[in-house]
């Protein structure tokens, strides 16, 4: 599952940027579909990953890493960013679903949506980067 999440993030970041591009092109329905699918996939992958980490753990797989002494600190940085991003992502989706009308078009919620969307985008990219760094330090650089 860990490898799946690492690879999924390689595809998630470009899909995120592609989906944002659809909103900028005023293709709001396509933007909504892409973002809802991406959000569902990410949340499902993270939940499955967390279940596996609780059942199997990761420390025994990383004991031979030359970075063993700093892995916990690196992981905490990643966790803080990823939890904050998850909260932002859920807020972005929930507010968008509640506030935007059908058919989709810009409205009074658009300014807030752009701001929280930018924070979510930055968080998702940082989550991916810190996750990749941790993955490499813990499991690849042995």
Regions found by a protein language model. Give the residues of each.
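Alpha-helical membrane insertion/targeting regions
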Residues: 1-142
């Amino acid at each position: 599952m860990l490898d799946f999440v690492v690879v999924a993030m390689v595809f998630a970041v470009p899909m995120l940027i592609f989906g944002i591009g659809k909103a900028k092109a005023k293709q709001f329905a396509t933007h909504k579909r892409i973002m809802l699918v991406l959000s569902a996939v990410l949340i499902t992958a993270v939940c499955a990953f967390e279940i596996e980490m609780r059942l199997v753990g990761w420390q025994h797989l990383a004991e031979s890493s030359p970075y063993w002494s700093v892995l916990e600190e690196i992981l905490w940085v990643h966790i803080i960013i990823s939890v904050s991003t998850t909260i932002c992502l859920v807020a972005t989706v929930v507010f968008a679903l509640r506030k935007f009308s059908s058919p989709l078009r810009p409205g009074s919620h658009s300014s807030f949506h752009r701001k929280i969307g930018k924070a979510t985008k930055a968080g998702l990219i940082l989550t991916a980067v810190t996750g990749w760094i941790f993955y490499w330090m813990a499991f690849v650089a042995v």
